[in-house]
């Protein structure tokens, strides 16, 4: 008799995705981040649901309701900090997942990669509107600064900003709609993640060598499920250590001051995971130019498959490309550091150089290096 998991219409879908899925035998721990992102998403939706039960999206009570969650709700403090630090873990996994895709040429799966880029934009939007909800100083001024960037759009900019605000400044209407967006977006992310998986399972996973591995596949369960569980345990361990020992390590102290439109914080900056893009935005002394650079810094990922010039898919056997990849990682870390610094000498010039290098690496240096490596392989 055939097992029910192979015949039942619903269980068959789950079985084909998580049990009998043919998987390359040589995929490393860098392939764990996809499942970790799924875990992060589920944790964020659950903690967010419980927070939404006690939160009030109103300018007069939002800050107090967050305080109430932390002080009066049973285990409210841990739910709140799991949600805040869970976002940081989400982005750590997200950037590792993207880095893996870049290094091993996973972007050759065009549909999967493009859905991934859309997912990145959606997650960034969710994190941004979520950061506004506690209605602290950084929430308010962050929302004001970032939404104001849209006013750089010629002709319709100002109208567009006021339309998003629901008034002439960031106020009650803005907070209410941002809460609505923050509630709905994770479910859109969930739907997109399923589409991401559907496209991935059309082709099967890539592997470190970048060579097709159809002749050497193993079932996903138990070999990779046990490996994913180990990764999940490590993720939960790190998240709990962060939440219980240093819950405010990655936050901004300014956000413990209620929002005040009459007092601007000394340094307005986003959460750490947006600092690299913020540094690129600030490095161009022109509003429209900065906004375009900010948009392109993320959108450039969609063009990566077209910029692939190598005869080999993975960077595993391409030392020069490997070197440039790690230069790119170092450059992004530099931009992240610069994004958190004030706009003054020498930070400005370092930020500008790092921004130029970022685009230069992706658009010129890496494709040209790949062509040189192709030539070397023929010698």
UniProtKB/Swiss-Prot annotation:
Family to which the UniProt record says this protein belongs: Belongs to the cytochrome b family.
Transmembrane segments: 33-53, 77-98, 113-133, 178-198, 226-246, 288-308, 320-340, 347-367
GO BP field: mitochondrial electron transport, ubiquinol to cytochrome c
Residues annotated for a ubiquinone binding in this entry: 201
PROSITE patterns: CYTB_CTER, CYTB_NTER
Role according to the record: Component of the ubiquinol-cytochrome c reductase complex (complex III or cytochrome b-c1 complex) that is part of the mitochondrial respiratory chain. The b-c1 complex mediates electron transfer from ubiquinol to cytochrome c. Contributes to the generation of a proton gradient across the mitochondrial membrane that is then used for ATP synthesis.
Pfam families: Cytochrom_B_C, Cytochrome_B
Record's subunit section: The cytochrome bc1 complex contains 11 subunits: 3 respiratory subunits (MT-CYB, CYC1 and UQCRFS1), 2 core proteins (UQCRC1 and UQCRC2) and 6 low-molecular weight proteins (UQCRH/QCR6, UQCRB/QCR7, UQCRQ/QCR8, UQCR10/QCR9, UQCR11/QCR10 and a cleavage product of UQCRFS1). This cytochrome bc1 complex then forms a dimer.
Record flagged with keyword DNA-binding: no
Note: Heme 1 (or BL or b562) is low-potential and absorbs at about 562 nm, and heme 2 (or BH or b566) is high-potential and absorbs at about 566 nm.
Residues annotated as binding heme b b566: 97, 196
InterPro entries in the cross-refs: Cyt_b/b6_C, Cyt_b/b6_C_sf, Cyt_b/b6_N, Cytb/b6-like_sf, Cytochrome_b, Cytochrome_b_C_euk/bac, Cytochrome_b_N_euk/bac, Di-haem_cyt_TM
Example of a GO MF term: ubiquinol-cytochrome-c reductase activity
Cofactor binding note of this UniProt entry: Binds 2 heme b groups non-covalently.
Superkingdom of source: Eukaryota
Protein name listed in UniProt: Cytochrome b
One GO cellular component term: mitochondrial inner membrane
Residues binding heme b b562, per UniProt: 83, 182
UniProt topology in membrane: Multi-pass membrane protein
């Amino acid at each position: 008799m055939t097992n029910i998991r192979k015949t039942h219409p619903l269980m068959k879908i789950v079985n084909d995705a998580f049990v009998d899925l043919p998987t390359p035998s040589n995929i490393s721990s860098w392939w764990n981040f996809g499942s970790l992102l799924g875990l992060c998403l589920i944790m964020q939706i659950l903690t967010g649901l419980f927070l939404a039960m006690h939160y009030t999206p109103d300018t007069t009570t939002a800050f107090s309701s967050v305080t109430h969650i932390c002080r009066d709700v049973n285990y409210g403090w841990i739910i709140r900090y799991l949600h805040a630090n869970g976002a940081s873990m989400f982005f750590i996994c997200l950037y590792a997942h993207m880095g893996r895709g870049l290094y091993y040429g996973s972007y050759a799966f065009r549909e999967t990669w493009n859905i991934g880029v859309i997912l990145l934009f959606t997650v960034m939007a969710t994190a941004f509107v979520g950061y506004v909800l506690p209605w602290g100083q950084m929430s308010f001024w962050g929302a004001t600064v970032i939404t104001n960037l849209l006013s750089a759009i010629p002709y319709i900019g100002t109208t567009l900003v006021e339309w998003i605000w629901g008034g002439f400044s960031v106020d009650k209407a803005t907070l209410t709609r941002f809460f609505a967006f923050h509630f709905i977006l994770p479910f859109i992310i969930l739907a997109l993640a399923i589409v991401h998986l559907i496209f991935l399972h059309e082709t099967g996973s890539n592997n470190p060598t970048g060579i097709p591995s159809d002749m050497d596949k193993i079932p996903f369960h138990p070999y990779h499920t046990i490996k994913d569980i180990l990764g999940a345990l490590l993720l939960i361990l790190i998240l709990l250590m962060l939440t219980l020992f240093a819950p405010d390590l990655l936050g901004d102290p300014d956000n413990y001051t209620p929002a005040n439109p009459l007092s601007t914080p000394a340094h307005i900056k986003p959460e750490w995971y947006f600092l690299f893009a913020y540094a690129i935005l600030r490095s161009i002394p022109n509003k429209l130019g900065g906004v375009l650079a900010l948009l392109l810094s993320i959108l450039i990922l969609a063009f990566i498959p077209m910029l692939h010039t190598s005869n080999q898919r993975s960077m595993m056997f391409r030392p020069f490309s490997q070197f440039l990849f790690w230069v790119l990682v170092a450059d992004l870390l530099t931009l992240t550091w610069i994004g958190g610094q004030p706009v003054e000498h020498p930070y400005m010039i370092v930020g500008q150089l790092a921004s130029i290098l970022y685009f230069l690496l992706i658009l010129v240096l890496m494709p040209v290096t790949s062509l040189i490596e192709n030539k070397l392989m023929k010698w």
